[in-house]
Regions:
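Conserved small/polar residues in nucleotide/adenosyl-binding loops
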Residues: 2-9, 247-254
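PLD/PLD-like phosphodiesterase catalytic module centered on the HKD motif
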Residues: 10, 16-61, 160-165, 170-249
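Short, glycine/acidic-enriched loop or turn micro-motifs at the edges of active sites
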Residues: 17, 74, 253
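Signature of lipid phosphatidyltransferase scaffolds
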Residues: 52-137, 141, 241-249
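A short, well-structured juxtamembrane/interface segment
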Residues: 148-152
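Structural alpha-helical scaffold elements that stabilize or flank donor/cofactor-binding regions
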Residues: 156-157
Length: 254
């Protein structure tokens, strides 16, 4: 219990993604002193468009100094997998000033769900830089003027000279991304994409498979992960760039 404690725990969960979670679960969290808020609550999905505007971010920030992000949600299936295989995912730990970017993303989301604007410097403590790697936190949303993530991917693909490797659970690229990948492959860049042989949603997986022939004709190499469900979203390029994405190569994630 956090009652009477100086520690503050905030949980922002997606309301649609947690439809099957009983209300008692959140009541117990709040009773223990945890602030839990659902993102864009949907009670009657047939009568609202909010069901399409979901929050797919997985962010943990601890004391403003350490953060975790990646593909992992919090559920038993992420540990136990399926009867037909493991759940393969990637999550990363971040230390240093890049944590500020994830803290900003979380607090912005918190304002949406709680209407509390949090700007205290205690959430952005001064800290030294770690190592010499450059890191940028890029966020995107459906109402922004620019599709920052898609534009960043386009720049990364067009800038690659030797290789560009992708892991993604769902391969539903926008037309610009698809064209960029094929163009790079035709120009001699080693383009490799790994997707799961079997996915958690059949319809989405069939849609992903529909792109493969066209891409392979352009020279893109396709690999199927066979040990279970691949949920990891990774990009590695030219020994100079790596990303751990929440973006799933899906037009809905622009």
């Amino acid at each position: 219990s956090l009652v009477g404690s100086e520690m503050c725990i905030r949980d922002r969960y997606d309301d649609v993604g947690c439809w099957k979670v009983p209300h008692l679960f959140y009541d117990e969290m709040r009773g223990a002193g945890i602030e839990a808020r659902g993102f864009l609550k949907v009670r009657f999905p047939v009568f609202t468009s909010k069901v399409n505007y979901r929050n797919h971010r997985k962010i943990v920030v601890i004391d403003g100094k350490v953060a975790f992000t990646g593909g992992m949600n919090i559920a038993l299936r992420y540990m136990k997998g399926f009867q037909w295989g493991i759940w393969r995912d990637t999550h990363i730990k971040i230390e240093g000033k890049a944590v500020y970017g994830l803290q900003t993303a979380f607090l912005t989301d918190w304002y949406v769900v709680d209407r509390t604007l949090i700007t205290s410097s205690r959430y952005f403590p001064e800290m030294d830089s770690y190592g010499n790697a450059l890191m940028q936190i890029v966020t995107s949303d459906p109402v922004g003027e620019w599709r920052d993530i898609m534009q960043g991917l386009l720049i990364a693909i067009s800038s690659s000279r030797k290789y560009f490797y992708i892991q993604t659970p769902y391969l539903l690229p926008t037309e610009p991304i698809l064209m960029a990948l094929k163009t790079a492959a035709l120009a001699g860049v080693d383009i490799r994409i790994m997707i799961p042989e079997r996915a958690d949603t059949r319809l989405t997986h069939l849609a992903s498979l529909s792109y493969l022939d066209d891409m392979m004709r352009a020279g893109v190499k396709i690999y199927l992960y066979q040990k279970g469900f691949l949920h990891s979203k990774l990009i590695v390029s030219d020994d100079t760039l790596s990303t751990c994405l929440l973006y799933t190569s899906d037009a809905a994630d622009e």
